[in-house]
């Protein structure tokens, strides 16, 4: 297997994308956070002491997408043109599922930006509600879809 982030001496390197074409890139990732009923109720009734949890998580997810190249060593800085979030609440499971779609025109994809955004958004929920429930679980952070670039479309089955 040829790993593009390693040189011939197995040293890490940032991939040279200068010869790649600029194309539309889009990726969507998702993840879930499970919590106690008390924590879930505090979020949906907007009574958490740290403020509006879901709105803050959305803002954090957007910031996370924009900061990806500062957090993941081999990621290129990108001119992101769109970050869109969607949160599904599941009362029976006491969980929230966060979806983040990131879009840009560039020479490299935005998969890492969408995955980072989901991670930061869910971590923000954890941070804001941990006084009520320290046993929350963040799970199932996955790439749902991507399109653009040489590898084409991907859709999680």
Swiss-Prot record:
- PANTHER family assigned to the protein according to its UniProt record, in alphabetical order: MOLYBDENUM COFACTOR BIOSYNTHESIS PROTEIN 1 (PTHR22960:SF0), MOLYBDOPTERIN COFACTOR SYNTHESIS PROTEIN A (PTHR22960)
Reaction catalyzed: (8S)-3',8-cyclo-7,8-dihydroguanosine 5'-triphosphate = cyclic pyranopterin phosphate + diphosphate
Q: In which pathway does it act?
A: Cofactor biosynthesis; molybdopterin biosynthesis
Q: Which GO terms describe its molecular function?
A: cyclic pyranopterin monophosphate synthase activity; GTP 3',8'-cyclase activity
CDD domains assigned: MoaC_PE
Amino acids binding substrate: 74-76, 112-113
Its GO biological process terms? Mo-molybdopterin cofactor biosynthetic process
Keywords, alphabetical: Lyase, Molybdenum cofactor biosynthesis
Instruction: Give the Enzyme Commission number.
Output: 4.6.1.17
Concerning Pfam families, the annotation shows: MoaC
State the oligomer form and interacting partners.
Homohexamer; trimer of dimers.
Please describe what this protein does.
Catalyzes the conversion of (8S)-3',8-cyclo-7,8-dihydroguanosine 5'-triphosphate to cyclic pyranopterin monophosphate (cPMP).
| Name the UniProt record assigns to this protein | Cyclic pyranopterin monophosphate synthase
Entry annotation: catalytic residues: 127
Family, according to the entry, reads as follows: Belongs to the MoaC family.
Q: Which InterPro entries match?
A: MoaC, MoaC_bact/euk, MoaC_sf, MoCo_biosynth_MoaA/MoaC, Mopterin_CF_biosynth-C_dom
Q: Does the keyword Glycoprotein apply?
A: no
Q: Which domain of life is it from?
A: Bacteria
